[in-house]
């Protein structure tokens, strides 16, 4: 199954009535995304061997929150949604969508917000980014979107991605239309932008018990049934791993068919779990999965592979 976004005026009456029964997509609601993430990162930093880095990530998330309100985005995406639907492509496809300089503004505003909080190597990194030309910034963005991580140092990547992510999330939150699930491929990628997930979450509330993958770029969530590999869609050789017990709120779902794994978070076990923060705070589980011979099928926006990884 794949997911397509249909312009509102092209939905049939039956689709309009049933669109909310099992929502294929949950577009980002940006009001509390970054503050909640920052708070969760700070909470998880306590008694965590990665505490310093989690607090560093919290500073970036807080800067995203501030810049979000300082630099709102106004854009009419109606035509783009229609064109993407006609072509069967994600409307905000990272591989073809022209990037507006708005994301440069977001990056420089984030740097200004972060500079008083940074010191040492981290301060040197953002000062270097502050001096980068528009062409250099675009080259780094293109490399990250092409998964050419060797071309962007792992200390610069989180800042570049944070600005791009905020830009894409602003656009995604403005999409006019509904989503429809249909037969197709590439369910492992975000239907809105084509990026990959950071983790998946079994939710509570109106989507109780449903699993949604969370995009590591535009913050959209899309539905994928449980007990099915989110990478290759096989279900015959799935296993679930945790560092605690069967009631753990964070597990890794591994697939013997494709040899990959993805974190799965359970809100019913801990309502405070957050897709990015809890994934980053459980890197010990990632190390265990690598020892077992599985490759990660996702990327955390605060932790990019370095050269040779």
Swiss-Prot record:
Q: Is Cytoplasm tagged as a keyword?
A: yes
Superkingdom of this protein's organism: Bacteria
Its annotated compartments are: Cytoplasm
> Predominant location of this chain?
cytoplasm
Q: What keywords are annotated for this sequence in UniProt?
A: Cytoplasm
Name the GO terms of the biological process aspect.
protein maturation
GO terms for MF = ferric iron binding
**Is Flavoprotein there in the keyword field?**
no
Q: Which GO terms describe its cellular component?
A: cytosol
Which PANTHER family does this chain map to?
PROTEIN FDHE
- Protein task: Necessary for formate dehydrogenase activity.
Q: Which NCBIfam families match?
A: FdhE, PRK03564.1
Q: Tell me which family the UniProt entry assigns to this protein.
A: Belongs to the FdhE family.
* UniProt protein name: Protein FdhE
Q: Lineage, please?
A: Bacteria, Pseudomonadati, Pseudomonadota, Gammaproteobacteria, Enterobacterales
């Amino acid at each position: 199954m794949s997911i397509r976004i249909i312009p509102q005026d092209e939905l049939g009456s039956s689709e309009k009535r049933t669109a909310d029964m099992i929502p294929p997509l949950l577009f980002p609601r940006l009001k509390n995304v970054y503050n909640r993430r920052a708070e969760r990162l700070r909470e998880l930093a306590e008694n965590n061997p990665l505490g310093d880095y989690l607090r560093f990530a919290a500073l970036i998330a807080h800067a995203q929150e501030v810049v979000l309100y300082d630099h709102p985005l106004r854009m009419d995406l109606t035509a783009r949604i229609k064109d993407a639907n006609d072509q069967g492509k994600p409307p905000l496809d990272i591989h073809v969508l022209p990037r507006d300089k708005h994301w440069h503004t977001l990056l420089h505003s984030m740097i200004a917000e972060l500079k008083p909080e940074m010191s040492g190597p981290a301060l040197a990194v953002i000062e270097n980014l502050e001096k980068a030309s528009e062409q250099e910034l675009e080259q780094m963005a293109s490399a990250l979107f092409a998964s050419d991580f060797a071309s962007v140092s792992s200390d610069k990547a989180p800042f570049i991605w944070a600005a791009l992510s905020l830009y894409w999330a602003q656009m995604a939150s403005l999409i006019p239309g509904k989503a429809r699930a249909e037969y197709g491929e590439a369910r492992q990628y975000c239907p809105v932008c084509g990026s990959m997930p950071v983790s998946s979450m079994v939710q509570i509330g109106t989507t109780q018990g449903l699993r949604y993958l969370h995009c590591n770029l535009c913050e959209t969530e899309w539905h994928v049934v449980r007990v099915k590999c989110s990478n290759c869609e096989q279900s015959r050789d799935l296993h679930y791993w945790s560092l605690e017990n069967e009631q753990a709120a964070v597990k890794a779902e591994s697939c013997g068919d494709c040899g990959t794994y993805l974190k799965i978070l359970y809100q019913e076990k801990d309502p405070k779990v957050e897709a990015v923060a809890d994934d980053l705070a459980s890197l010990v589980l990632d190390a265990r999965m690598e020892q077992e011979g599985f490759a990660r099928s996702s990327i955390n926006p605060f932790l990019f592979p370095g050269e040779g990884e």
